[in-house]
Amino acid sequence: MSLSNEQVGRIARLARLAISEGEIDAVRAKLDGIFGLIEQMQAVDTAGVEPMSHPQELATRLRDDVVTETDRRSAFQSVAPQTEAGLYLVPKVIE
């Protein structure tokens, strides 16, 4: 697929790109290369190929779900102004 200068200009306007007349040929060549690659990919027969999310079937390595932090509630509540039964007491702000 080969693009014309008008088509390249239209694509540039739609993409809000400022392309000078001297740059159109270089941009057209790059776009032609991209569209050529797309045509090659579309020509591949994928009938019977099952869709996949990743190219390789690998399991995600996860760490063991173990507690890594000790319970420090008493240390945190020791510096609080008021606590009761493991809860923080705060002044009433809504009447």
From Swiss-Prot:
SUPFAM superfamilies on file: Glu-tRNAGln amidotransferase C subunit (SSF141000)
Function: Allows the formation of correctly charged Asn-tRNA(Asn) or Gln-tRNA(Gln) through the transamidation of misacylated Asp-tRNA(Asn) or Glu-tRNA(Gln) in organisms which lack either or both of asparaginyl-tRNA or glutaminyl-tRNA synthetases. The reaction takes place in the presence of glutamine and ATP through an activated phospho-Asp-tRNA(Asn) or phospho-Glu-tRNA(Gln).
The protein's name in its UniProt record: Aspartyl/glutamyl-tRNA(Asn/Gln) amidotransferase subunit C
Molecular function per GO: asparaginyl-tRNA synthase (glutamine-hydrolyzing) activity; ATP binding; glutaminyl-tRNA synthase (glutamine-hydrolyzing) activity
Enzyme class: ligase
Reactions mediated catalytically: L-glutamyl-tRNA(Gln) + L-glutamine + ATP + H2O = L-glutaminyl-tRNA(Gln) + L-glutamate + ADP + phosphate + H(+); L-aspartyl-tRNA(Asn) + L-glutamine + ATP + H2O = L-asparaginyl-tRNA(Asn) + L-glutamate + ADP + phosphate + 2 H(+)
Keywords: ATP-binding, Ligase, Nucleotide-binding, Protein biosynthesis
GO BP field: glutaminyl-tRNAGln biosynthesis via transamidation; regulation of translational fidelity; translation
InterPro entries cross-referenced by the UniProt entry: Asp/Glu-ADT_sf_sub_c (IPR036113), GatC (IPR003837)
Source organism (scientific name): Azoarcus sp. (strain BH72)
Documented EC number(s): 6.3.5.-
Domain of life the protein comes from: Bacteria
Protein family per UniProt: Belongs to the GatC family.
Assembly description: Heterotrimer of A, B and C subunits.
